[in-house]
Amino acid sequence: LGQREEPRRAQPRDGELGEAVERAQDGDEAAFAVAYRIVQPGLLGYLRGLVGDDAEDVASDAWLEIARDLGRFKGDGAGFRGWTATIARHRALDHLRRRRVRPRSSALEQDVLDLPGPHNTHDQALEAMSTEQALRLVGGLPQDQAEAVLLRVVVGLDGPAAARVLGKRPGAVRTAAYRGLKRLATRLGAEGVTDEAPRTLGESK
């Protein structure tokens, strides 16, 4: 696929997030609220891709666990995003098992590992979409590709972090994410994206 390993993609507020988490671990409730406000939008978008309308309830359960286990977390702001995504994913899968429903995009699991840098056509295609449009289109991808795209674009994880969330090898996650983003770009008629849109996507309207 010609992909290159990329350095970790820092999110704009990761520094602020890391500081807030550190203060929250020392008992600062206002700092925990700051961390929540930074992380919650992406986490909720990820959960919507997994459990649909039940995302808010699952997110509430996840945050209870995050608050309870906060003292055990070690890492920076980017690490906290990955840690919270892992907890949210476990709660989502528990929820789906209880309901005995298959994940809408079970492989909403994969990520986006080491994709080409932040300004490539695939990212631009997704950035042009609203969250609602993105989730609708992502829901039409194969499961592994869908979750990979959600972790990269909605949660904002880098490749290695997404691989840890999913318990998969970086290479497998990287490939799934690349293919998922390429399919989405092709569906959107993104300029400069050619060829191999897999048939699965081409068949859906």
Language-model features and meaning:
Residues 21-45, 67, 134, 146:
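A short, charge-rich alpha-helical start-of-domain segment used by transcription regulators
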